[in-house]
Amino acid sequence: MAVFALIPAAGMGKRMGASINKQYLLLGGMPILARTLEVFERSPLVDGIFVVIPADEIPFCREQVVERHGFSKVRSIVAGGAERQQSVLNGLRAMEGTAGEYDVILIHDGVRPFVTEDILGRATATARENDGALVAVPAKDTVKVVEDGIITATPSRETLWLAQTPQAFRYGVIRAAHEVADAERFLGTDDAMLVERLGRQVRIVLGDYRNVKITTPEDMVLAEAFIKEKLP
């Protein structure tokens, strides 16, 4: 069974407040997206990479990210949709004819550059034996359910996990889940949710608190500290 990475990076990054989309901001001298792709390019597990970005950014991404950094595993750069879910579906459809039904697809945020080879390996192994694998970390803070500014519930922290990526599935499973959601016009908050609603079980894989998604200026400060430790 082959393993393919699907990297959605079609977001506009409004919360970052930058003049360019967040995936192209420099982190240790390289665009964040390039840092992320580098992990999958170097991984012996990964056979190919599909990147999903806004249609008007495809030439820039090809020249300034993929070709400039020599990412030979990138099979296709796909135009994204209005929502992340549509972008992932576009990527899955682009894999048709390349990915087999039982091949593993690692869906990973383009602005989450600190994922490790260990996490990729455990997510892949879990997806091969289950309906899906969700990388996550236990919640450290108490979480409150709030309605109209009033606390209505305090879930047990022991049952709460914070979802990260990659989220890993066999191609046939995740393609079917996305096609059903698209047909029913259902918009989920992540890929695992679409698989769960079909009655399938997704198993948790322990992630890493450093596997952050860079969304805000505060995240960028944290990422810069991490990259300083990582670089020689």
Curated annotation (Swiss-Prot):
Stated EC number for the protein is 2.7.7.60
Q: Which PROSITE patterns match?
A: ISPD (PS01295)
* Broad enzyme group: transferase
GO BP annotations listed? isopentenyl diphosphate biosynthetic process, methylerythritol 4-phosphate pathway
- Which pathway does the protein contribute to? Isoprenoid biosynthesis; isopentenyl diphosphate biosynthesis via DXP pathway; isopentenyl diphosphate from 1-deoxy-D-xylulose 5-phosphate: step 2/6
The record places the site described as Positions MEP for the nucleophilic attack at 157, 213
Q: Does the keyword Manganese apply?
A: no
* Reactions it catalyzes: 2-C-methyl-D-erythritol 4-phosphate + CTP + H(+) = 4-CDP-2-C-methyl-D-erythritol + diphosphate
Q: Which UniProt keywords apply?
A: Isoprene biosynthesis, Nucleotidyltransferase, Transferase
One Gene Ontology term of the molecular function aspect:
2-C-methyl-D-erythritol 4-phosphate cytidylyltransferase activity
Q: Which NCBIfam families match?
A: ispD
Q: What does this protein do?
A: Catalyzes the formation of 4-diphosphocytidyl-2-C-methyl-D-erythritol from CTP and 2-C-methyl-D-erythritol 4-phosphate (MEP).
Which family does the UniProt entry place this protein in? Answer: Belongs to the IspD/TarI cytidylyltransferase family. IspD subfamily.
Q: Which PANTHER family match?
A: 2-C-METHYL-D-ERYTHRITOL 4-PHOSPHATE CYTIDYLYLTRANSFERASE, CHLOROPLASTIC
Q: What protein name is recorded for this chain?
A: 2-C-methyl-D-erythritol 4-phosphate cytidylyltransferase
* Designated gene of the protein: ispD
